[in-house]
Amino acid sequence: MRPPAQARWEGQGPTAPLRLRSGARWGRGRPHCWVYVRVRVTIGYHLDRDDSGGMATTSAASDSACSAAPPPVGGAQAAAAVEEEEREVVRVRVKKCESFLSPEFRSFAVDPQITSLDVLQHILIRAFDLNGKKNFGISYLARDRLGQETFLSLLSDWDLSTAFATASKPYLQLRVDIRPSEDSPLLEDWDIISPKDVIGSDVLLAEKRSSLTTAALPFTQSILSQVGRTLSKVQQVLSWSYGEDVKPFKPPLSDAEFHTYLNHEGQLSRPEELRLRIYHGGVEPSLRKVVWRYLLNVYPDGLTGRERMDYMKRKSREYEQLKSEWAQRVNPEDLEFIRSTVLKDVLRTDRAHPYYAGPEDGPHLRALHDLLTTYAVTHPQVSYCQGMSDLASPILAVMDHEGHAFVCFCGIMKRLAANFHPDGRAMATKFAHLKLLLRHADPDFYQYLQEAGADDLFFCYRWLLLELKREFAFDDALRMLEVTWSSLPPDPPEHEVELVGPPSQVADTGFGSHRGRPVRQRHMLRPAGGGGGAFEDAVVHLAASSQGPSGGGRLLRQASLDGLQQLRDNMGLRKDHLVQLSHPATLISSKSLSEPLLNSPDPLLSTSSRPDSPSSSSPPSTQEASPSGDIAVGSPLMQEVGSPRDPGKPVPPPPPMGLPPPQEFGRGNPFMLFLCLAILLEHRDHIMRNGLDYNELAMHFDRLVRKHHLGRVLRRAKALFADYLQSEVWDSEEGAEATAPS
């Protein structure tokens, strides 16, 4: 009996798809035969890695053939063998992304005919050692109908077959995103639940406290708390002088060191010292998930580790409930308007970062959209304003959990909601204080800006509104934010973080509405004389109010650069003064919301437009802006800003004046002002040497978006902040009371 012309056996394993093939040829009436066996082994992964960011190109596939008297093969058979070889091998390149850790790369080859999604997952687990991180997503690089590259999720064997068929030439590019699950111990593995976890921590307590005292940088909340503390106690930690900026930063707070700030029950026992430590060097990326909740005042005081875990789970369930109530809280028209407005900003927020890369309907972008929509629906007095997506984006990326991120976002918005109020008072105060600080720190530079017509500092609007989030690369911005938050005093909620805001008050919004139907208005500041489209795309005011079933109004505002006009009004800028500073503008209003929401691709990103140069002239406007007396601090600056000057006369040097105390300065966030000052001073010489006018100066800083050097800015800001705290040049009755001996 003759054997078959070709025998074939296939075996399948989790990491090594295997195919063996044997063939035999028999000659009629001839006593000899030849048999050949071809063995192909495809190993599931290749351990070479390319840490520089490139893909390793060496394949782990190997072929071996053993033959005894191989059969003759013709040219057609050879071509068929090559074609079959191409069908049997798909080269794969994989990039693993895990939070903010450096990406890892692997390269291997698989047989598409016998490689299922389950087999591929086993290969990736072995390749990247993912045994403890089973919750990960796989996506492959493909091209959409327009030819744009995008990552598509691999959710089934059918998806994998499609990837092999359409996206494997010359190789299949995969991305693995690690996502810890909600109940994974990775979320809270640094929370102490058992006392045995902190054995020996008391031994380190005295040593840690001593080292913090001797090397401490200025710490704001030591002043802000005002509970039985005097300035002399604050000065005990001010051991770093202005000239010592060459000292390196302390290393980021580690997991082990964080445990020393907790007691035997896992409660945070030294919140002030923890913030001071973070002010020194930031937090390790793997620790941010928990530490940021303290910095954003999410946890009530005194929670143990187990109580914190239960608290976050409960608040997450509360968020999911609120998310399901959108339709009950707003009418369909307003809800659709809110969602579309939020979506336009979400789709352009941090898309270059791996966490938000991928298709527009990706899970992270969808989570950011739902988070912001829920906030707008549940906080009608604030609603949604452009820029909020920039504040929520880093929080969601760090928490990697939609519900937890929403709780933290509510925590930070408790402090920053005033930035987005339509009356512009909060932003006007911050501008006034930054102007006062620059005038105090560098009179010559301030005088130069006055002569250039740039002393209003409106090109810094994005800095103050978003607390400099866009001025640094994403990872640097995370560190800058946590250092800034650590300079603020602890303010834990008395009971829990409130996830629902007060109802809307239409009378307080400053916008009218027609009875019985929504009224939406769009306001733009445009130059009176065609000076380059001053605020044409950069300043958009959008309002929407409607009467809901309960009779309460609802307001949605877009593009917070609209606050520039309110800032001018609140800061007492008269129109004749605006003309001399080349700020002629007319207000164009009552445009329908059916028009595009934003003309600029990213209004907050560009503030370089200016109506005219300082040398141009415009007829004075007859329309007066009513000044506001709402700024409580820095009245000398307000008097100086509100009065016109003769452009032909030299600007006299400003007289020395004090600065507000920390609890008032920058509306309670003074360190943010010093960061802004540090950025200005970093570029002072370049600006003055090249004689930049307002437009050139604003464009200069627009080009530096996400490019500022965090190390230099932090060192300079901390040194200036130390001088401020030591100088006691505080001009406020409250400040005088705070510095009085107790």
From Swiss-Prot:
It is found in: Cytoplasm; Cytoplasmic vesicle, Autophagosome. Transmembrane segments: none annotated. GO terms for cellular component: autophagosome; cytoplasmic vesicle. The modification Phosphoserine is found at S194, S560. PROSITE patterns: TBC_RABGAP. The keyword Cell membrane does not apply. SMART domains: TBC. Its main location: cytoplasm. The modification Phosphothreonine is found at T214. The keyword Manganese does not apply. It holds the Pfam family RabGAP-TBC. Residues 1-22, 592-664 are annotated as: Disordered. Residues 600-628 have a biased composition (Low complexity). GO terms for biological process: autophagy; regulation of autophagosome maturation. InterPro entries: Rab-GAP-TBC_dom, Rab-GAP_TBC_sf. Keywords: Autophagy, Cytoplasm, Cytoplasmic vesicle, GTPase activation, Phosphoprotein. Acts as a GTPase-activating protein specific for RAB33B. Involved in the regulation of autophagosome maturation, the process in which autophagosomes fuse with endosomes and lysosomes. Interacts (via N-terminus) with MAP1LC3B, GABARAP and GABARAPL2. This is TBC1 domain family member 25. The lineage of its organism: Eukaryota, Metazoa, Chordata, Craniata, Vertebrata.
